[in-house]
Every structure is written in structure tokens, then in C-alpha cells.
Amino acid sequence: MSYRSLSSLAGLALGVSVMTMSASAEDLKGEIAPTGKLRVAIGISAAGGAFWSNKTASGGYSGVPVDLGKDMAAALGVPVEYVAYLNSGQITDAASRGAWDVTFLPQDPERETRMSFGPIYEVADATYIVKAGSPIKDFATLDQDGVKVAAVNNTTTMRGAKAHLKHVRVTGYQTYDEIFNLLKNGEIDAFALSRDQLNAMSKKIPGTKVLDETFKKTVTAVAVPLNHPQSLAFVTKFMKDAISNGTIRKAYDNNGLKDSPIRTQ
């Protein structure tokens, strides 16, 4: 076979390879960003941490999921669009409606039946904060008839608190801000949430106390709707790379979490 023929075959093979790669990229975009934008579901609250995002004064959003979503969209080569919800339970309920393409939220067995999870990027200890002046000092004195405990509705922490407390009825509320005000006004005895968020809350409400014990470890991970295999493969690789190349560390640092380690297990 002549050199020219070999060159032609090599060129043809390269062309087919490029076309295949291009088709694969388009297939991925069609699955993970069917509207032409990467729709990132975020939970809005002043709680902070690795899951919650905030509405900015300019009308935009800030937070770890906001930064990760923007970087993920850039890697895909599509614009980003944020879809805001009051809590992680609302994000979960919207998973089957095609309302979002990717999210970052606490993972538990119930949610694993409703969406597909990729790598964990945060592990948090869940506990309780008690109101100012409360005699409650530990889980034993908390778990008593008549004690009022609140949690954000339909969240992994609420399900964990309900399983943990045997004598207390845990009441769910739609937003962190609503429960914050109830605790501040002394209308509830305790609030179940992750320790880092409760530690920050205790500085805003003098006299409150975060209990030392932990009733649940909550893991936060990237997730996509069920039956999106290309999307899951893409976000899995993205998050593994983001953990190793400093992308997540940068997102933490940019959002007031410079002292928080990246915990993956």
C-alpha cells in the first residue's frame, strides 16, 4: 500500500474519531442540558455551609453549589441557570418533573430511590441547638415528653431526628429562616441541623447551646435525575477532579468555609 493510501486511511480514521467524539459530546449535552442550559437546583437559606446558597443583593446567587454549578457548566460548554428551592426536600420532589439537571444535596436511602448520586464532597455531624435558658444539656434531657423540636421539612436531618428521638414529636417547617426565628423567640426548644450551621447560629442567638453529641452523619453529594447514565458519568468525573484539583477547596474558601475541611468519608 502506498504512503498516500496510508495517509488517506489515517486521515479518514482521525475524521471518524473526531466525529464520534463530537457526537458523544452532543449526546451528553442533550441528556444533561436538554434546554441548552445546565439547570442547577439550589436550596436558598442564610444557613451557609456546603449545601445552602444565598440570594445576593444584586439578585444573583452565591454559595458552594453555585460555584460548582458554574464550573460544571463551563466544562460542558453551556450556560448555567440556577433553579431555587426553599429546602432540599423540594429539590427532591422536583427530581421526577424534569425541573433541574444537576444538584448538590444531602444523600440518604430515601433519596437514592428518586435520583442518582455521584461522589460525596461533605460529611457533617447532625445535632441539636437548644434555646437560651433551656435546662436541656444532652440527648437524654432533650428526649422528653413535651419538648418541641423543629427541623427543615422533608430533609435527611428531619428523618434522622425522627428516628433518633423516641418521646419527642419533631415538627417540620419549610425554611431555615422560619425555624431560626422560632428559636430566637423561644417558641421551640431545639432545632436539628448540622453542627457547623448550628455553631454559626449560636453566635447569632446569644444564650443558645449546641449539644455535644451527634445523632447522625449527613453526607452531601452531587446528584442527577434517575436514568441519566451519561450525566451521572460526567458529574462523577467532574467531582472527582474537583476534589483533587482544588476546585471544591476554592468554592469553600470563596463562601466563608476556609476553616472547613473537604470530607469525603
Regions found by a protein language model. Name each.
Residues 44-47, 58-75, 107, 127-180, ...:
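Bilobed "Venus flytrap"/periplasmic-binding protein-like clamshell domains
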